[in-house]
Amino acid sequence: MSDKAMNLFGARDTLQVPGSDKKLYFYNLNKLQGHDVSRLPVSIKVLLESVLREANDYDVRREDVETVAGWSATNPEVEIPFKPARVILQDFTGVPAVVDLAAMRSAMVKLGGDPSKINPLIPVDLVIDHSVQVDEFGTEFALANNMALEFERNRERYEFLRWGQQAFDNFGVVPPASGIVHQVNLEYLAKGVQSRAEDDGEVVYPDSLVGTDSHTTMINGLGIVGWGVGGIEAEAVMLGQPIYMLMPEVIGFKITGAMPEGATATDLALRVTQMLREKGVVGKFVEFYGAGLSNMTLPDRATIANMAPEYGATMGFFPVDDEALRYLRRTGRLEDEIGLVEAYYKAQGMFRTDETPDPVFTDTIELDLATIVPSLAGPKRPQDRVNLSDMHSVFNEALTAPVKNRGFELGSDKLDAQGTIGGTDIKIGHGAVTLASITSCTNTSNPSVLIAAGLVAKKAVEKGLKTKPWVKTSLAPGSRVVTEYLETAGLQQYLDQIGFNTVGYGCMTCIGNSGPLPEPVVEAIQEGDLVVASVLSGNRNFEGRVNPHIKANYLASPPLVVAYALAGTVVNDIVNDAIGQDSNGQDVFLKDIWPTNAEIQEAMDRSINAEMFKKVYDGIEKSNADWNAIPVAEGALFDWKEDSTYIQNPPFFDTLAGGAHEIESIKGARALVKVGDSVTTDHISPAGSFKADTPAGRYLTERGIAPKDFNSYGSRRGNDRIMTRGTFANIRLKNQLAPGTEGGFTTNFLNGEVTSIFDASTAYKEAGVPLVVLAGKDYGMGSSRDWAAKGTFLLGVKAVIAESFERIHRSNLVGMGVLPLQYKNGETADSLGINGDETFEFVLPGDLKPRQDVTVKVTGKDGNTRDITVMCRIDTPVEIDYYKNGGILQTVLRGILSKSQGEVKA
């Protein structure tokens, strides 16, 4: 076996770049004898180039090249390897990833290996964007004060990352207050084409990546293959392992026509999300094609690509074309780099034009851009799109609808409930907009909707309109370039005047870091037990995510966020009812403050240029003085501190000595959690704040940490003790094993008591009882949060049985040695009469195969046992190895240790 690359098919060729005499090589797909790759989807061509270039007859084989080159619309499910060019991280997922790498180094020393072998082999960039919160808003001091609080709360985490910067090769950090990882990636980090030095010259190849955040797909808008993975999978990639995946189906999404007046990129993204969720694209690539792409700007494409997790696809891919080249120029990329991108993609037959023949796809779907109308999505899921004109009636219907994806099931006697805002005579009712936030890289990367929001604010101020006093407002750009062009356009001042001051450069409200609502507003909500609303330009609106007091959450474009802040409610018809009165007492309607497409374009043309991007990103890694002032610890090994509440050495490698275990049946298991459909990773492992009376809160209180210093679950992901206590602790979790409760509770079947999920798991662990989770459809949807799998594992859960799994979470469960099982033939726990109070035995053969049927013996309280058949969702042979080793990192570490010890013996 060798890890030296081969030159299969003699495909290594010289690339000529016009205007350059630099000698470059590439792996030419057109030299693949016996394969016509001309009509392959472009996304598949990128995978093909990767296996062709990386073929070494070891972890990437000749048959892998043949498999990808022979991709067909009806491919059988065959496993292929993929080696991305780089990895991106954000700090909530990045800190635990670096913790794992540090723990692997400690384990290597303990086992007699060389810790320096644990080192990223490809470029890794971590952008700190998840920690800043909206504590202060609506003032000119909000940005500075929120940044100060961020550093105060996260000092220990940031010291750890500073250590990581010096300890690991190929590891860069973009400091706090720089922007959101996906927007920074789009505007700065992405190159289009990567290169590496070989003996006789430089080899160039497509930029590609994985990221520890599900919205990594935003980069697909620039024609770059990439998607979100769990931290454990990303760590394996950093250490040189391929990602093993089933050959994907590719759904072609044909775009025709052009956008109408008044519609935005957000409206388009919400429509695409709705269509693709209805289509069913989980685990599939979506590739956009058609002449209508020429009527879409690259930021519009990036907005759609960003929401691939919301429509369930692995990617939402747009091929490189002239618009991609224009975007690279507009964002200040070097002309030599742009010329290389053009030459490379044209040479490979990957460059799109309106005349490009349509690729062959697994299936297709079509959308005429002219049909897009202003929209929102909610109140609980991003795929539940609502026409703006119907918003008021749909919300009012939701108040009494059953509690499922769209309803709140209020009785008729509760519909007129009100609450009084303390210290005033102002009353609010159901549908009051208590939070309006321009947030998220999904939209703040798109100048057209940010400029539109600024123009709405300008027109509103000129007419004397003000934001309603119960609305918490915020603007959190995904990059500092946004501030540059809003100020140049003269629009930031108007946003400031109606409360949309910049509160930080990070994810903030979109990920639940919205900060507390003003206490008088909270009291009014509680007084009337109100279903109040948020309107945000984010990408997710799951229950309990945005703010614990806000039950109805709607995704909308930035200009609509501003409009709803002015209206103050979703109950009224915002299209036809007045949203306020001007200084003369005359009614003002939405149409009076809504900008035309021409007004938006004019403002963009005069306020955005490439020099802005160069100014913002030149030296950004050292641009934050507070970051630079943090002292840097030296050394290859991290000095773990037992009293730290942020960073602890996790127990994942404690049992690494010895080889992989044999697959054995799981006997005597009990159900810890039973849930319905659409349970998200945020339900499983919440990222937001927590209270003193939770298991995590009690853990910190016992260690002298005051509640004001708890920070958030997301910021504590470097400490497994806290994260285990926070697993299944979302306040909106509805565990059917603890009826009548909401949050992290279950029934301990050893004694029949309702208790916290953590306390129950501890009791089961002490009694030697393995655990199981029972779930419905789309289990684990949402963020790529690997702690949703890590926490599940640490609670003692050995298996999860679901009707279906979201892609990343299924992979993460296997990566942690937890067995994912799927009901067959449309069966469910309820249809099979499984209540959750039974005991379970999972009959696993020693030679378990991918996607094999296995038997589960279910024994009821009456002692009767029946067998059910489920599918093992370990999908590939490599995943079988991961499961035998107890997880992916254990597999990788054993391999590195074996190789290291072999080198020593040699």
Curated annotation (Swiss-Prot):
Any one Gene Ontology MF annotation carried by this entry is: iron-responsive element binding
Where are its TM segments located?
A: none
Q: Which reaction does it catalyse?
A: citrate = D-threo-isocitrate; (2S,3R)-3-hydroxybutane-1,2,3-tricarboxylate = 2-methyl-cis-aconitate + H2O
Q: Which residues bind [4Fe-4S] cluster?
A: 441, 507, 510
Cofactor requirements of the protein:
[4Fe-4S] cluster
GO BP terms: namely: propionate metabolic process, methylcitrate cycle; tricarboxylic acid cycle
Which InterPro entries does the annotation name?
AcnA_IRP_Swivel, Acnase/IPM_dHydase_lsu_aba_1/3, Acoase/IPM_deHydtase_lsu_aba, Aconitase/3IPM_dehydase_swvl, Aconitase/IRP2, Aconitase_4Fe-4S_BS, Aconitase_4Fe-4S_dom, AconitaseA/IPMdHydase_ssu_swvl
Pfam families referenced in this protein's UniProt entry, alphabetically = Aconitase (PF00330), Aconitase_C (PF00694)
Describe the subunit structure.
Monomer.
Protein name (Swiss-Prot/TrEMBL)? Aconitate hydratase A
Q: Which organism is it from?
A: Deinococcus radiodurans (strain ATCC 13939 / DSM 20539 / JCM 16871 / CCUG 27074 / LMG 4051 / NBRC 15346 / NCIMB 9279 / VKM B-1422 / R1)
Q: Which gene encodes it?
A: acn
